[in-house]
């Protein structure tokens, strides 16, 4: 039986966090999952801010491709009610990430608020 890798940082782990699942984020997450071995990525994490019923299939598809769902702590239960199983909350995902790719319109604002602290 193959041992499951942890999502938390280690000396040799490489975790990529993609923020946003829109026009840019969704295909990027899929591409990173497809090229994980070639790019030496251990985990592709993706953050989804809002649980939307019409995006359940999109989130499930990304998880099926091997991506790890990350949500805000205050939305965790809302995602679970929709049938999702988030594996991390945003605070832990940011600390585990070696690379953060923000695909949201608020990316520049997030840089000042979140990423400069990293």
Regions found by a protein language model. Give the residues of each.
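A structured beta-alpha segment of the ubiquitous adenosine-cofactor-binding alpha/beta core
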Residues: 63-110
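A short, basic/flexible loop-to-alpha-helix module at the beginning of a structural domain
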Residues: 1-14, 90-91
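A short, gly/pro- and small-residue-rich
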Residues: 113-118
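Glycine-rich phosphate-binding loop and adjoining beta1-alpha1-beta2 segment
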Residues: 37-80
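Glycine-rich adenosine-cofactor-binding loop
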Residues: 14-32
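A general structural motif
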Residues: 11-13, 41, 96-97
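Short glycine/serine/threonine-rich phosphate/pyrophosphate-binding segments
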Residues: 24-28, 107-112
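A general structural signal for stabilizing positions within well-ordered secondary structure
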Residues: 18, 35-36, 91, 95
């Amino acid at each position: 039986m193959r041992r499951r890798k942890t999502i938390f940082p280690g000396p040799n782990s490489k975790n990529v966090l993609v923020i946003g699942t829109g026009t840019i984020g969704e295909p990027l997450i899929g591409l990173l999952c497809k090229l994980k071995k070639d790019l030496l990525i251990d985990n592709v994490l993706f953050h989804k801010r809002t649980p939307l019923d019409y995006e359940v299939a999109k989130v499930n598809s990304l998880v099926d491709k091997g991506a790890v769902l990350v949500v805000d702590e205050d939305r965790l239960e809302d995602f679970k009610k929709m049938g999702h199983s988030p594996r991390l909350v945003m605070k832990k995902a940011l600390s585990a990430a070696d690379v953060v790719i923000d695909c949201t319109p608020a990316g520049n604002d997030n840089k000042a608020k979140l990423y400069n602290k990293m």
